């Protein structure tokens, strides 16, 4: 693949900008720039050369969704104005339990298509207790970089029987998925160990999940300190604050990504930094569920890696990295008037720090040998303006762009989305299929509710 004439924003430093520069990628990796890119493109024997005209456009490392629930895409626009725990109990857990493989597939394909069309190249997906194969199948068909797996939930006191799996069953399913999917699709698919949160898992399961992740070298993906009621419940049950408890059971570490950390405090900042654990900041979800505002400036000052995620379409209603970037940039200005989060830092959180949170191997950014996972933006589409006012384009991206500015999304050196193709290569399910899946899901939810009334 040859991307010609773009402005390359590598995001290694604020001045990591190369204007009017060609980029050549082969076998999923960036190989060369400028004249050398043209030379390699002419000499390639890897088949037909794909050319992208990026003149007047910006090329940057791909956006990463560091916390996502693809199983919830069809649950969008359900009950509103709820806080976390009642929202889970009333809508989300019944909805997840009502999935079959077919509706899970529709939900995943729709969410992945929505993500690719917004420039997202990689996702860390929480999945659900069952039908995880449908998620991996959708990811494999889409060409997105996918880290996910089944969700572990076994506590009979806090989880519904329809969405519960005994510890042995849940861990065995994670092992099966690892054998079936890990490293498949040219390495684009990875399995994670995913205890949902301390509220829904027994202590024994949490400890065994940590052991399994260590044994297999897998990413750990969980929720923590999202909501005050959740934090109080965890401390009442375990005798420890939420994040300290995760450390006590062995779940913190450099391959762990914790979603939210809204109510993390000073001891947590130091502990997360010491363990090398990443945090996925999900501002729109935290606002919509009245959870609060993540202390991102304090986390970053402590040395904690902070990435961005949209959470699920059921709790923010859009899988849109641009909205998360905007909110991530603006919210600190309300909470901490004396400081701000620069647009450059927000873009790093949405890209390079997201890749780090997913433990993606190899060099990051736009350097030779880095993954050819790229987002190409058109600054002159819609209401954004070219970067005439500033030598740096970062503010324009964080504050005034949206998915309409995404000209193309490249994953592993393959174009997976072009703006001219709103169907995302046929990945997006037709409207009739989406409506049918929602109706089937809702009918099963209503039947289950009537049976327990």
Language model: regions and residue ranges:
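N-terminal metal-binding scaffold of metallo-dependent hydrolase/deaminase domains
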Residues: 1-44
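Metal-coordinating catalytic core of metallo-dependent amide/deamination hydrolases
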Residues: 135-261, 267
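His/Asp/Glu-enriched, well-ordered alpha-helical/loop segment
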Residues: 248-255, 297-381
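C-terminal cap of metal-dependent C-N hydrolases
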Residues: 371-428
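Active-site gating loops and adjacent loop-to-helix segments of metal-dependent hydrolytic enzymes
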Residues: 74-106, 150-168, 228-253, 275-278, ...
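Histidine/acidic-residue-rich catalytic or RNA/ligand-binding cores of hydrolases
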Residues: 228-240, 268-273, 290-299, 316-331, ...
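Alpha-helical scaffold segments that flank or form the walls of functional sites
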Residues: 57, 76-144, 170-186, 435-440, ...
């Amino acid at each position: 693949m040859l991307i010609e004439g773009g402005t390359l924003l590598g995001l290694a430093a604020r001045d990591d900008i190369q204007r009017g520069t060609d980029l050549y990628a082969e076998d999923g990796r960036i190989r060369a720039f400028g004249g050398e890119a043209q030379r390699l493109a002419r000499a390639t024997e890897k088949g037909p050369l794909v050319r992208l005209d990026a003149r007047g456009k910006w090329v940057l490392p791909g956006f990463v969704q560091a916390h996502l629930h693809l199983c919830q895409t069809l649950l969008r626009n359900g009950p509103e104005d709820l806080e976390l725990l009642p929202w889970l109990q009333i809508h989300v857990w019944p909805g997840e339990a009502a999935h079959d493989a077919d509706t899970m597939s529709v939900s995943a394909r729709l969410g992945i298509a929505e993500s690719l069309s917004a420039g997202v190249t990689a996702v860390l997906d929480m999945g659900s207790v069952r039908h995880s194969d449908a998620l991996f199948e959708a990811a494999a068909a889409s060409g997105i970089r996918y880290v996910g797996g089944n969700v572990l939930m076994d506590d009979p006191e806090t989880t519904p029987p329809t969405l519960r799996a005994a510890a042995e069953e849940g861990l065995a399913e994670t092992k099966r998925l690892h054998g079936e999917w890990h490293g498949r699709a040219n390495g684009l698919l990875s399995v994670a160990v995913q205890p949902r949160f301390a509220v829904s898992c027994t202590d024994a399961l949490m400890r065994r999940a940590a052991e399994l992740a260590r044994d297999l070298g897998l990413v750990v993906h969980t929720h923590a300190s999202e909501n005050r009621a959740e934090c109080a419940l965890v401390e009442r049950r375990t005798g420890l604050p939420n994040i300290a408890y995760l450390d006590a059971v062995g779940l913190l570490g450099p391959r762990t990504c914790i979603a939210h950390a809204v109510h993390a405090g000073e001891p947590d900042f130091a502990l997360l930094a010491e363990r090398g654990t990443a945090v996925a900041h999900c501002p729109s979800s935290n606002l919509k569920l009245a959870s609060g505002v993540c202390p991102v400036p304090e986390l970053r000052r402590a040395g904690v890696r902070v990435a961005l995620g949209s959470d699920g379409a059921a709790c923010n209603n859009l899988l849109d990295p641009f909205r998360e970037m905007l909110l991530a940039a603006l919210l600190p200005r309300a909470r901490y008037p004396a400081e701000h989060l620069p647009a450059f830092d927000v873009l790093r959180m949405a890209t390079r720090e997201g890749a780090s949170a997913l433990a993606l191997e190899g060099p990051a950014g736009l350097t030779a040998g880095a993954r050819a996972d790229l987002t190409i933006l058109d600054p002159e589409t819609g209401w954004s303006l070219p970067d005439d006012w500033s030598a740096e384009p970062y503010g324009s991206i964080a504050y005034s762009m949206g998915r309409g500015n995404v000209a193309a999304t490249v994953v592993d050196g393959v174009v997976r989305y072009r703006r001219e193709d709103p169907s995302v290569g046929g990945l997006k399910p037709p409207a009739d299929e989406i409506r049918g899946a929602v109706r089937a899901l809702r009918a099963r939810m209503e039947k289950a509710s009537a049976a327990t009334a």
